[in-house]
Amino acid sequence: MQAVQVKVLNPKITEDKAFSLPTRATDGSAGIDLRACIDEPLTIKAGTTHLIGTGLAIYIQDPNFAGMILPRSGLGHKHGIVLGNLVGLIDADYQGELMVSIWNRSLEDFVLNPAERMAQYVVVPVARPEFEVVTEFSDTSARGAGGFGHSGRQ
């Protein structure tokens, strides 16, 4: 995979020590943390969503990969802060600012601070099959057309 390009859209990312360019927290980290690029603390009321900029654009280029914005497990478990769209899928050819939909699913207000880590970004491989329109499938699977709850609890 070729290098993924990162464009800094907000100068405070390179000028303010509270902010930083995205890096992996450890050698084993799958992704990078995305920080809230906001000027002042933002109160996210219980049950509401806010669209928060990261101040970054990430251009993958290679169509065999995509970016995924995922919630941070600690924020979700401890504070009920997850993504409004649950998972953000970022196409390889997208060049705009990465925005994060933050949803406070808890019963209490949450204060998001400037430069706070709010989500994570992971690059994943993408299968790009050709699609063939058919009138019947070439064979029958054990599941067939069984839908919701078909293979588990009824």
Swiss-Prot record:
Pfam families in the record: dUTPase (PF00692)
Annotated coiled-coil segments of the chain: none
Gene3D superfamilies xrefs: 2.70.40.10
Keyword Isomerase: no
InterPro entries recorded: dUTPase, dUTPase-like, dUTPase-like_sf, dUTPase_trimeric
Similarity-based family: Belongs to the dUTPase family.
Pathway assigned in UniProt: Pyrimidine metabolism; dUMP biosynthesis; dUMP from dCTP (dUTP route): step 2/2
Cited function: This enzyme is involved in nucleotide metabolism: it produces dUMP, the immediate precursor of thymidine nucleotides and it decreases the intracellular concentration of dUTP so that uracil cannot be incorporated into DNA.
Entry keywords, A to Z: Hydrolase, Magnesium, Metal-binding, Nucleotide metabolism
GO MF term (any one): dUTP diphosphatase activity
GO biological process, one term: dUMP biosynthetic process
Name under which the protein is recorded: Deoxyuridine 5'-triphosphate nucleotidohydrolase
Taxonomic placement: Bacteria, Pseudomonadati, Pseudomonadota, Gammaproteobacteria, Moraxellales
Cofactor(s) the record lists: Mg(2+)
Positions bound to substrate: 72-74, 85, 89-91, 99
Gene: dut
Catalytic activity: dUTP + H2O = dUMP + diphosphate + H(+)
